[in-house]
């Protein structure tokens, strides 16, 4: 099993917080987002870590994991970034994470235990959280449809 962290973008909506560093270098408490994600992978025995980088790629040099460069990071989207890891996705089971969303180590543990072809974590209370950020929560929300298991 491998981890893929999507960290190519700048996070320009964060303004001055990403002028000198990628959004994944911002902190929750005393720890950078990227470090928390990697630590949660390692705790769950995901040793092969791949990071798709772009903006400020040199800042990622000392971070554990293989770096995969998206040279089109300014003009492409998250799916293009993910396509940079196509060989890995085709050859191994992978957990894919955004670099600016922190998942609890227990959430990663749940993903590791699942056996479906595609498994997605979701928060059933998403709307309450997104209403804090946006008047219309659907303005900036990535979404998916799902059916419950029987």
Set out the residue ranges of the language-model regions.
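Conserved N-terminal catalytic core of the sugar/cofactor nucleotidyltransferase
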Residues: 2-5, 13, 27, 31-96
């Amino acid at each position: 099993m491998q981890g893929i962290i999507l960290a190519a973008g700048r996070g320009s909506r964060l303004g001055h917080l990403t002028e000198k560093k990628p959004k994944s270098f911002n902190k929750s408490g005393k720890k950078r987002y990227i470090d928390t994600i990697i630590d949660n992978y390692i705790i769950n025995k995901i040793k092969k870590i791949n990071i798709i980088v772009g903006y400020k790629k040199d800042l990622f040099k000392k971070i554990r994991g293989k770096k995969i460069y998206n040279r089109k990071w300014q003009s492409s989207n998250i799916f293009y970034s993910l396509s940079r890891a196509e060989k890995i996705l085709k050859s191994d089971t992978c957990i894919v994470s955004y670099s600016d969303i922190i998942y609890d180590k227990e959430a990663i543990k749940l993903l590791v235990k699942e056996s479906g072809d595609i498994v997605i974590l979701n928060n059933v209370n998403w709307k309450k959280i997104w209403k804090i950020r946006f008047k219309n929560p659907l303005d900036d929300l990535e979404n998916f449809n799902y059916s419950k298991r029987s």
